[in-house]
């Protein structure tokens, strides 16, 4: 959350790598060199081909997510899925299988990463059977796991 809050005002650092680096460093989230490089790389790719990031075309959700993972340095399946979930909460057919959901399946995310797509497929199937969007089900599970009544403890950072 601190890292996002530090850089969310794009116009304050747009095109200025050293200013972006300072903002990330001051947020004290670590890995400022890599984060700066990854964010600058994403900025260039995004603004050079916006449609590639906003429209999946004929791709399945999984194909689109996998395509984006290859294009966005520093993001894997979970964080890319999270972005898609937030952008398309009701129709998204990929889900952020974070450490908590790996634990739900009795797995360790570090050791069992190869099972990501299998547990994601199961999660999506279970959600579809219950007629609940997977993102909504995941948010409910995550909030409950964090002993929170709702997602406001982190989502406030997306406002203003």
Tell where the protein language model's regions lie, with residue ranges.
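Short alpha-helix boundary/capping elements
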Residues: 1-2, 15, 47, 109, ...
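Structure-specific DNA junction-binding interface
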Residues: 1-31
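Extracellular-facing segments of soluble proteins and assemblies that are Gly/Ser/Thr-biased and enriched
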Residues: 23-47
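Extended hydrophobic/Leu-rich segments
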Residues: 10-13, 46, 157-158
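C-terminal accessory module of base-excision DNA glycosylases/AP lyases that mediates lesion recognition
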Residues: 35-43, 51-160
């Amino acid at each position: 959350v601190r890292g996002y809050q530090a850089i969310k005002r794009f116009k304050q650092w747009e095109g200025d790598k050293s200013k972006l680096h300072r903002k990330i460093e001051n947020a004290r989230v670590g890995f400022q060199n890599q984060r700066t490089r990854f964010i600058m790389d994403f900025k260039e790719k995004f603004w050079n081909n916006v449609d590639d990031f906003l429209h999946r075309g004929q791709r399945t959700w999984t194909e689109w997510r996998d395509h984006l993972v290859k294009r966005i340095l520093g993001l894997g399946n979970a964080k890319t899925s999270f972005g898609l979930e937030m952008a398309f909460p009701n129709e998204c057919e990929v889900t952020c299988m974070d450490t908590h959901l790996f634990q739900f399946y009795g797995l360790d995310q570090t050791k069992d990463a190869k099972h990501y797509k299998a547990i994601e497929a199961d999660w999506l199937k279970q959600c579809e059977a219950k007629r609940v969007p997977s993102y909504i089900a995941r948010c409910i599970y995550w909030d409950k796991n964090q002993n929170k009544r709702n997602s406001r403890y982190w989502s406030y950072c997306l406002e203003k």
